[in-house]
């Protein structure tokens, strides 16, 4: 029921990652490279265009992501290189503006400020270049893979990552959701949630330039997504060492797209070139599920109850657990979604939650006005610009 880091055994991961990817399981794939399923998108067009064969193709993709290597490459997903170049030019304009504006630069799993990052690139592209947005996100390979993993109604976000020449590799990790939680938090989620978390998100990347191995395309450990304790294991030294010696790394061409299970052990590689700015548009596609049925103004709720909650906190008769219970019922307990331009993950993987803010207010005995002002500022940071 409950998992702990003490339960992690490297031998269990080794047994899973020693699995051979069987080409017969993926009849529509063009090849298997270093255990990774590779599809030539030109060869998929006929199957993708017919409803019955499209479903079979999607089942194969989902199998590769869940039970197979956990990763699939779609070569030539964007056939029009000029479209990629035009979108890249918009991204470069945004990056140049960010440099002129200064300010802190947060990042996930990498050294802040060492590379270039555009948060909420999807919205920024739509506002700046709606014609390019329409052509770019009309891509059927992105929709094919996203709906294969998540079904209909998914939501797409994107963050552009540019690894500059000399940019160093990320630390191995798993991704959103549980991958963003420290072990002491991840251990509080029951085992079945560890199993369910990968089904809420699909990770992808569009190559916006040719990415030879020396430019540091992403490192992957095929089949590692099947390790049930992986969200607690990836920070452990022996697991990191194993990743460093057993990962695979595939070169990509401009317009290729990679999709992978967010539970796959992976990390961006070191850019050893002197001139290649390795640009990828990182797609994070989310399930329509995982949301509450009703919209609740939690800022209003917390502001309304704070004085009574503060009295309870000050009372010797109140168990601290009961205070935590009230905070859980009233405040937003998750840091996402947020605006990562204003609410950056500096010093960690996730910004402060509203619930953590309320707990701090009680611990420091803030008055009502101070709490209300802090809540308003917190909500403002999370809003899109």
Where are the regions that the model predicts?
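Non-heme Fe(II)-dependent double-stranded beta-helix
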Residues: 17-183
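Double-stranded beta-helix
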Residues: 185-188, 197-267, 289-292
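Active-site-adjacent segment of 2-oxoglutarate/Fe(II) JmjC oxygenases
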Residues: 284-337
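A short hydrophobic beta-strand segment most commonly corresponding to one strand
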Residues: 222, 275-291
């Amino acid at each position: 029921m409950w998992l702990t880091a003490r339960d992690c055994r490297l031998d269990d991961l080794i047994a899973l990652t020693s699995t051979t990817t069987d080409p017969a399981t993926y009849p529509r794939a063009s090849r298997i490279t270093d255990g990774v399923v590779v599809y030539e998108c030109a060869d998929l067009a006929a199957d993708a265009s017919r409803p019955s064969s499209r479903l079979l193709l999607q089942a194969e993709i989902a199998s590769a992501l869940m039970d197979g290597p956990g990763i699939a490459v779609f070569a030539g997903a964007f056939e029009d290189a000029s479209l990629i170049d035009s979108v890249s030019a918009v991204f470069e304009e945004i990056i140049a503006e960010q440099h002129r504006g200064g300010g802190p630069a947060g990042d996930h799993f990498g050294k802040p400020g060492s590379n270039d990052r555009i948060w909420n690139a999807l919205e920024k592209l739509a506002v700046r270049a709606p014609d390019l947005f329409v052509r770019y996100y009309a891509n059927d390979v992105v929709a094919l893979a996203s709906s294969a993993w998540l079904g209909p109604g998914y939501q797409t976000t994107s963050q552009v990552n540019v690894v500059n020449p000399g940019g160093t590799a990320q630390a191995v990790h798993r991704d959103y959701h549980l991958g963003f939680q420290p072990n002491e938090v991840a251990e509080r989620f029951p085992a079945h949630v560890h199993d369910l978390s990968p089904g809420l998100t699909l990770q992808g990347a569009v190559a916006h330039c040719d990415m030879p191995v020396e430019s540091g395309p992403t490192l992957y450990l095929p089949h590692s997504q099947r390790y049930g304790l992986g969200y607690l294991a990836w920070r452990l030294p022996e697991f990191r060492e194993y990743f460093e010696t057993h990962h695979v790394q595939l070169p990509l061409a401009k317009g290729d797209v990679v999709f992978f299970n967010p539970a796959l052990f992976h990390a961006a590689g070191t850019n050893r070139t002197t001139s290649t700015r390795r640009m990828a548009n990182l797609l994070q596609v989310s399930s329509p599920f995982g949301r509450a049925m009703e919209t609740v103004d939690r800022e209003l709720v917390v502001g309304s109850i704070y004085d009574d909650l503060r009295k309870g906190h000050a009372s010797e008769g109140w168990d601290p657990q009961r205070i935590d219970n009230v905070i859980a019922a009233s405040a937003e307990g998750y840091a996402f979604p947020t605006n990562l331009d204003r609410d950056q993950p500096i010093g960690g993987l996730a910004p402060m939650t509203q619930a953590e803010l309320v707990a701090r207010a009680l611990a420091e005995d803030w008055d009502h006005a101070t709490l209300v002002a802090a809540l308003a500022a917190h909500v403002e940071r999370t809003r899109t610009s």
